């Protein structure tokens, strides 16, 4: 179930302030955030935002097709290393 349209999209205030401060800057730095729940706004396009995945900050370059999605969608929290191979043949 999605968010109500009358409420509008959510973005943390501290993240929005960091993005607005970077818009006037000549050189764009990586913006570090722990807010995986924030929605990507059109003003974020072109920035690199480092999203925390529980261990480290994963750099995510924001593109136009990401607008409307959440930041956490682009920083996976779990590492999948594949299923363990069966060693039934080698045990005989």
From Swiss-Prot:
The lineage of its organism: Bacteria, Bacillati, Bacillota, Bacilli, Lactobacillales. InterPro entries: Ribosomal_uS19, Ribosomal_uS19_bac-type, Ribosomal_uS19_CS, Ribosomal_uS19_SF. One of its GO terms (cellular component) is small ribosomal subunit. GO terms for molecular function: rRNA binding; structural constituent of ribosome. Belongs to the universal ribosomal protein uS19 family. NCBIfam families: rpsS_bact. This is Small ribosomal subunit protein uS19. Keywords: Ribonucleoprotein, Ribosomal protein, RNA-binding, rRNA-binding. One of its GO terms (biological process) is translation. Protein S19 forms a complex with S13 that binds strongly to the 16S ribosomal RNA. PROSITE patterns: RIBOSOMAL_S19 (PS00323).
